[in-house]
């Protein structure tokens, strides 16, 4: 049963939360989910060791998570080849990338995703970083969610030819 937003607590993720976050990630995979990372939460965590991590708790249980990190803008450009898509480097030296977010299906649509994303954004601002999120352009749910929070589409589209 869904909880009221007032009963949700956002806090920093600790090691004891990793198993639950991995479980939530598995619960959220399916036909209605677009995955921007080609691997699981466990693999992501093992490779990237994210520097920004939050969980949402309801009644003392973890019901959602968000993870990502802050990198220097120059490194961000080389990773995503976005050299000509951002503001001049003198404006924003640090970029906070929100990489993964997961909400237990039983606790959706009560503001947890919004609260986690806001916490991530505040942490980026605290560290003097701009916040960026990569999403598939046909992920209408995520696009609508992000736009409702004030994010704008950067207009970047990656084309490919196999």
Predicted segments, located by residue:
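Conserved acetyl-CoA-binding loop-helix of GNAT-fold acetyltransferases
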Residues: 103, 109-122
């Amino acid at each position: 049963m869904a909880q009221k937003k007032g009963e949700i607590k956002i806090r920093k993720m600790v090691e004891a939360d990793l198993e639950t976050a991995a479980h939530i990630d598995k619960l959220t995979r399916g036909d209605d989910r677009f995955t921007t990372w080609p691997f699981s939460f466990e693999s992501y965590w093992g490779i990237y060791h994210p520097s920004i991590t939050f969980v949402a708790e309801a009644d003392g249980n973890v019901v959602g998570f968000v993870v990502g990190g802050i990198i220097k803008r120059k490194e961000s450009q080389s990773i995503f080849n976005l050299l000509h898509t951002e503001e001049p480097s003198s404006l924003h030296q640090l970029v906070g990338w929100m990489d993964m977010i997961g909400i237990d299906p039983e606790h959706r649509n009560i503001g947890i995703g919004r609260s986690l994303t806001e916490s991530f954004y505040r942490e980026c601002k605290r560290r003097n970083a701009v916040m960026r999120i990569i999403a598939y352009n046909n992920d209408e749910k995520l696009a609508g969610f992000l736009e409702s929070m004030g994010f704008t589409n950067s207009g970047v589209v990656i084309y490919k030819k196999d």
